[in-house]
């Protein structure tokens, strides 16, 4: 039997506000446990929550960016459940009237096609605290620094049909919230976490299968592995005559499998009701207009501009626009170096390889955009060849200065003197007289392969400094003259 996979995602993004959503406590990551928890965060009696307007503004930014409906009147509700790191015994969230309604996000698939993923809603809520199990023998510690941190929970439609589509969607959300500046996207620190709802159904069946939710997956690689593992588990279970039970599961990356955590709750299990301590939030058109006016260029807009303005392929444009920092770096290189396609190649290949090797992001690059742009200028004016440029790039990465100083100190300037190249070629051809005769006796097809040998010998003789274009032109004339 052929199976179809159905995936919907809930992405929890920690908003980059200076203070928490309902209190004045700081949201700095990594502080000593319980040093950023006020009486409001601790759930002490007699204290009242006060809504952080910046969190509302950020939620509206996201909603406008995905062309979503923004609720003119939205309500905060109490989501009731017990857990040790939830001090009030309820979480302040949104249910019936969320701040962001239906929207959509377009994702680029591996084959270059674009798929539209629906967004059901995005609502504001407070994060819970954190249970610490490792440092306490036979006990659990509670850190409430995270309690009350503003979250925007982004709920997708069940529109994804493979783990790769799901990862592409999460990457698109990740890029978008970073572009907007509303979340740092640091998955290792929990700034962006994903719950994956997975089900399978026979190909052609309209009704959805029974779904299972995989909680708190925090890397792109684990999202793909967790979903694929759960897909296979469900298919194996059904084909063996069993039934999928709706439940919440956890992904174990060491065993590459999901395991049952608890039965899946429905909304009525949480007994949602409007929070009496918080008034309904009314979002006026003037507020929305001010938010819209402050929106930056979005990833999809940047991709389109990179293609039209710089003549880049869709693939190159998508790669370069995958993060705001990389896009800005690329444009800075182009503004200095001039050649967009050359800049794109160096940023994606050579710089990308260097950053991967060092394990750093582009904003920590040892080679600045000014340095790389300056080096590309020297390629374009024939001061150095592309091959020599790699030596210059390595020296810049090692902190030896800019391109001009490195070219000067290492004597890397390209030989462009026609007379000098002509003399060098004569000496090289004389030393390879037998190969010259073979070349002249060969047919056109064989000559193409043999010509590369002479080019290689010429570059070797010049220690890579001869201008390759001049070498090719003069060499062809000598061999066929």
UniProtKB/Swiss-Prot annotation:
Keywords: ATP-binding, Ligase, Nucleotide-binding, Protein biosynthesis
UniProt key word ATP-binding: yes
Domain of life per record: Bacteria
MF term (GO), any: ATP binding
Annotated protein name in UniProt: Aspartyl/glutamyl-tRNA(Asn/Gln) amidotransferase subunit B
Organism ancestry: Bacteria, Pseudomonadati, Pseudomonadota, Gammaproteobacteria, Pseudomonadales
InterPro entries recorded: Asn/Gln-tRNA_amidoTrfase_suB/E (IPR017959), Asn/Gln-tRNA_Trfase_suB/E_cat (IPR006075), Asn/Gln_amidotransferase (IPR018027), Asn/Gln_tRNA_amidoTrase-B-like (IPR003789), GatB (IPR004413), GatB_C_1 (IPR042114), GatB_Yqey_C_2 (IPR023168), Gln-tRNA_amidoTrfase_suB_CS (IPR017958)
NCBIfam families membership: gatB, PRK05477.1-2, PRK05477.1-4, PRK05477.1-5
Gene: gatB
């Amino acid at each position: 039997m052929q199976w179809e996979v159905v995936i919907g995602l809930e992405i929890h993004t920690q908003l980059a506000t200076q203070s928490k959503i309902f209190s004045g406590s700081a949201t700095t990551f990594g502080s000593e446990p319980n040093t950023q928890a006020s009486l409001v965060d601790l759930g002490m009696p007699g204290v009242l929550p006060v809504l952080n307007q910046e969190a509302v503004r950020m939620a509206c930014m996201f909603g406008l960016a995905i062309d979503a409906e923004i609720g003119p009147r939205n309500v905060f509700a109490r989501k009731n459940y017990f857990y040790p790191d939830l001090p009030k015994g309820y979480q302040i969230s949104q249910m019936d009237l969320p701040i962001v309604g239906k929207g959509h996000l377009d994702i680029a698939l591996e084959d270059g096609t674009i798929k539209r993923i629906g967004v059901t809603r995005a609502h504001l809520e407070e994060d819970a605290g954190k249970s610490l199990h490792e440092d306490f023998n036979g006990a659990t510690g509670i850190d409430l620094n995270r309690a009350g941190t503003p979250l925007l929970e982004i709920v997708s439609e069940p529109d994804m049909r493979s783990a790769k589509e799901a990862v592409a969607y999460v990457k698109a959300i990740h890029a978008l919230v970073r572009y907007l500046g509303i979340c740092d996207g640091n998955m290792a620190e929990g700034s962006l976490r994903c719950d994956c709802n997975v089900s399978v159904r026979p190909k052609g069946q309209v009704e959805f299968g029974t779904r299972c939710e995989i909680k708190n997956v925090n890397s792109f690689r684990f999202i793909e592995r967790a979903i694929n593992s759960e897909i296979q588990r469900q298919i194996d279970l059904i084909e063996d005559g069993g039934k999928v039970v709706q439940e919440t599961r956890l992904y174990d990356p060491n065993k590459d499998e999901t395991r049952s955590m608890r039965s899946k709750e429905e909304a009525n299990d949480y007994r949602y009701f409007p929070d009496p301590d918080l008034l309904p939030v009314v979002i006026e058109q003037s507020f929305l207009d001010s938010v819209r006016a402050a929106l930056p260029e979005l990833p999809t807009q940047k991709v389109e501009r990179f293609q039209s303005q710089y003549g880049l392929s869709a693939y190159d444009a998508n790669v370069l626009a995958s993060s705001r920092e990389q896009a800005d770096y690329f444009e800075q290189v182009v503004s200095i170096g001039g050649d967009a396609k050359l800049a794109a190649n160096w940023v994606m290949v050579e710089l990308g390889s260097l950053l991967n090797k060092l394990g750093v992001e582009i904003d920590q690059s040892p080679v600045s955009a000014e340095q790389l742009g300056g080096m590309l200028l020297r390629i374009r004016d024939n001061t150095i060849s592309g091959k020599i440029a790699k030596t210059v790039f390595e020296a810049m990465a090692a902190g030896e200065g800019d391109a001009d100083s490195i070219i000067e100190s290492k004597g890397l300037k390209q030989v462009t003197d026609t007379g000098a190249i002509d003399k060098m070629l004569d000496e090289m051809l004389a030393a390879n007289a037998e190969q010259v005769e073979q070349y002249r006796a060969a047919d056109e097809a064989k000559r193409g392969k043999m010509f590369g040998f002479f080019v290689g010998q010429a570059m070797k003789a010049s220690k890579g400094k001869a201008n390759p274009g001049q070498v090719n032109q003069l060499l062809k004339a000598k061999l066929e003259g």
